Amino acid sequence: MWGLAKFGFYFWGVTTYVVDLTLCTGPSMEPTLNANSDLVLLDRVSPRLGRIATGDIVVADSPTRPGETVCKRVSAVAGERVPGSFFADVVPPGCVWLLGDNRRNSTDSRVYGPVPTDIVKGRVVLRVWPLDQARVFI
């Protein structure tokens, strides 16, 4: 019994603080990710260390729908100019600007604005499934 509890504790610690598997669903990241639930490996350390960079694909808590997550690409980090902005909009400290790769079918920072980095759950480093489309993203 103690062995099972110990395993559970370690598993919880690893998936909470180091790496985790999650599903990315929806058309907003096509063609990079499939709309039909790609299973991806998340690096959960990078956001905690402030190592999220422009171009990274991240999973974050949804800014508009509690209990849901979004999978988007970081298009600007704090201090960088918002891409495509007609004004001199700059991402504020502690935030990132998230966009879907499929701009025509994505609800992203163009709708909900800058996203606080503390709701970024992890950086996508690997598509695990479908197996024939496995891909490294770092």
Residue ranges and their predicted role:
Residues 78-84, 127-129:
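Short, conserved beta-turn/loop elements at beta-strand boundaries and strand-helix junctions
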Residues 100:
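Phosphate/adenylate-binding glycine loop and adjacent helical scaffold
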Residues 70-76:
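Short beta-strand-centered aromatic/proline hotspots
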Residues 83-93:
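Acidic loop->beta-strand submotif enriched in PP2C/PPM serine/threonine phosphatases
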Residues 1-69, 89-91, 117-119, 123-138:
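Protein maturation boundaries and topogenic segments
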Residues 109-119:
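Segments surrounding the PLD/"HKD" phosphodiesterase catalytic module and close analogs
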